[in-house]
């Protein structure tokens, strides 16, 4: 399946909306923030009651580190880094991460099954693990936490295992959602109407 540029943008918004709605429906209050993206991403963040912040560049790992440090500076108790392409994420997955943190006394990480990357990481204030996202980052993050003596739990929630990085991921996601084409077309039409 090959998506047009408009369809790729639409898919990104579909997935981001799922992530933000999952955050907004957790049993524990989590303040959603979105870092970076275009005006559509900013609009989606606003629509889903998330705070939007600009991306000041330097690559994804620097952007994540800057966002985490910024949150720590304003005494946020902890931060969960979630990519916007978690199509199967649900509120229970996020609640499970929070529970595994044992009242924010340990960091929590979730593996991307397909490439060994990191699909989520919860870092309580004072437990910064230097971001090293990308293929194989799950093991890197575990190693960095170990070096820094940060206690770490692993979350195996199903909705955190799958992200859309490869064509076969898109096919699997499409097959799992009976409304995929309808929702994608709705978003594509909406983007074209502006």
Language model features: what each stretch is:
Residues 1-10:
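Glycine-rich N-terminal loop/short-helix segment of MobA-like nucleotidyltransferase
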Residues 10-29:
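A short, N-terminal amphipathic alpha-helix
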Residues 27-51:
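Acidic donor-binding segment of Leloir-type glycosyltransferases
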Residues 77-85:
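Short beta-strand-to-loop acidic/aromatic patch adjacent to the donor-nucleotide binding site
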Residues 143-194:
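Conserved alpha/beta core of the MobA/IspD/sugar-nucleotide pyrophosphorylase nucleotidyltransferase superfamily
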């Amino acid at each position: 399946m090959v998506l047009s540029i408009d369809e790729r943008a639409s898919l990104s918004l579909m997935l981001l909306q799922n992530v933000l709605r999952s955050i907004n429906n957790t049993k524990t209050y989590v303040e959603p923030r979105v870092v970076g993206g275009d005006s559509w991403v900013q609009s989606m963040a606003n629509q889903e009651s998330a705070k939007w912040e600009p991306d000041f560049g330097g690559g994804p790992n620097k952007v994540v580190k800057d966002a985490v440090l910024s949150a720590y500076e304003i005494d946020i108790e902890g931060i969960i880094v979630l990519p916007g392409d978690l199509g199967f994420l649900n509120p229970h997955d996020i609640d499970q991460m929070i529970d595994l943190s044992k009242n924010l006394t340990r960091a929590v990480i979730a593996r991307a099954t397909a490439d060994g990357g990191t699909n989520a990481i919860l870092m309580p204030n004072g437990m910064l693990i230097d971001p090293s996202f990308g293929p194989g980052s799950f093991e890197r993050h575990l190693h960095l936490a170990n070096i820094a003596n940060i206690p770490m739990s692993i979350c195996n929630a199903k909705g955190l295992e799958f992200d859309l990085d490869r064509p076969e991921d898109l096919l699997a996601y499409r097959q799992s959602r009976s409304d995929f084409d309808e929702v994608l077309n709705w978003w594509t039409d909406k983007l074209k109407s502006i």
